[in-house]
């Protein structure tokens, strides 16, 4: 059991590690940084630093002050390939207005979840939504398999179908305490609290130091300095 849970931890770690890489005009541009600071865990100065990063990313392909999916994928995943379940899912969770683009407020609010000071419950909720592909309020076995396969593809890892199935079997054996073939939010919460390493890459330490680290870092080299 412990080996299989370790396997699931490794997959989750690879999943969230895509965030752990150099991460750092909607209409109205910056807007009200004090309001955003009150509604996120960022300070006003951190919001202002994030905005400088946002401007850089949003001008990588089309200089329109908004981040489209191609710019998002270039920045976050170092690829602009059209088919990527993993990238699509992350973008969809950032895109709370569901209009196919990210404004600065969406960008800042989503990254707030990854701040070291963000509440653990916010991190649990975000990670749960990543796997809840059908947005039904629970995670089915096939959803876990889809995301595991997508994550492995993004990270260049190769595991046999037998190993993947074994990881999923043992994960559900531990997490699905109601024995209904799915993992609801409370079961997910219990699982990740029992295995905190599942969430370790939901925290980006350098977001706490963004005012001193930006602009010395950017997502990837594709986002050129102007």
Curated annotation (Swiss-Prot):
Keyword terms: Lipoprotein, Membrane, Phosphoprotein, Repeat, Vacuole
PROSITE patterns (UniProt xref)? EF_HAND_2
The subunit field of the Swiss-Prot or TrEMBL record says:
Homodimer. Part of a K(+)-channel calcium-sensing kinase/phosphatase complex composed by a calcium sensor CBL (CBL1, CBL2, CBL3 or CBL9), a kinase CIPK (CIPK6, CIPK16 or CIPK23), a phosphatase PP2C (AIP1) and a K(+)-channel (AKT1). Interacts with PP2CA, CIPK1, CIPK2, CIPK3, CIPK4, CIPK6, CIPK7, CIPK11, CIPK12, CIPK13, CIPK14, CIPK16, CIPK23, and MTN1.
Subcellular location(s): the record lists: Vacuole membrane
Q: Where is the EF-hand domain?
A: 36-81, 82-117, 119-154, 163-198
Q: What is this protein called?
A: Calcineurin B-like protein 3
Q: How is it modified after translation?
A: S-acylated by PAT10.
Its family remark reads: Belongs to the calcineurin regulatory subunit family.
UniProt note: domains: The N-terminal 22 amino acids are sufficient for vacuolar membrane targeting. The internal domain (109-199) is sufficient for the interaction with MTN1.
- Its job: Acts as a calcium sensor. CBL proteins interact with CIPK serine-threonine protein kinases. Binds calcium ions. Binding of a CBL protein to the regulatory NAF domain of a CIPK protein lead to the activation of the kinase in a calcium-dependent manner. Mediates the activation of AKT1 by CIPK proteins (CIPK6, CIPK16, and CIPK23) in response to low potassium conditions and in the context of stomatal movement. Negatively regulates the enzyme activity of MTN1 in the presence of calcium.
**Which residues of this protein are annotated with the site description Involved in dimerization?**
155
- Which cysteine residues pair off into disulfide bonds? none
Q: How does it sit in the membrane?
A: Lipid-anchor
Q: Is GTP-binding among this UniProt entry's keywords? A: no
Q: Which GO terms describe its molecular function?
A: calcium ion binding; kinase binding
Disruption effect?
No visible phenotype when grown under normal conditions; due to partial redundancy with CLB2. Tolerant to low-K(+) stress. Clb2 and cbl3 double mutants show stunted growth, reduced fertility and necrotic lesions at leaf tips. They also have a reduced vacuolar H(+)-ATPase activity, are hypersensitive to excessive metal ions and are more tolerant to low-K(+) conditions.
Positions carrying Phosphoserine: 216
- Biological process GO annotation list? calcium-mediated signaling; detection of calcium ion; potassium ion homeostasis
Tissue distribution is: Ubiquitous. Stronger expression in roots. Expressed in root tip and root hair zone, leaf veins, vascular bundles and vasculature of sepals.
Q: Which GO terms describe its cellular component?
A: cytosol; membrane; plant-type vacuole; plant-type vacuole membrane; plasma membrane
